[in-house]
Amino acid sequence: MKVRPSVRKMCEKCRIIRRHRKVMVICTNPKHKQRQG
């Protein structure tokens, strides 16, 4: 899980979602998991 000031899609399978007022990226590739923080 990467914590970044700006999250973006790293591949076409990345999905941007919002959980508990946090913007997150979920993907089939675990290296692409990100959270805005």
From Swiss-Prot:
Residue runs in coiled coils: none
Cystine pairs: none
Keywords associated with the record: Chloroplast, Plastid, Ribonucleoprotein, Ribosomal protein
GO cellular component annotations of the record: chloroplast; ribonucleoprotein complex; ribosome
GO terms for MF: structural constituent of ribosome
One GO BP: translation
Presence of keyword Ribonucleoprotein: yes
Subcellular location: Plastid, Chloroplast
Stretch forming the signal peptide: none
SUPFAM superfamilies referenced in this protein's UniProt entry, alphabetically: Ribosomal protein L36
Keyword Ligase: no
InterPro entries tied to this protein: Ribosomal_bL36, Ribosomal_bL36_sp
The family this protein is said to belong to: Belongs to the bacterial ribosomal protein bL36 family.
Record protein name field: Large ribosomal subunit protein bL36c
The gene coding this protein: rpl36
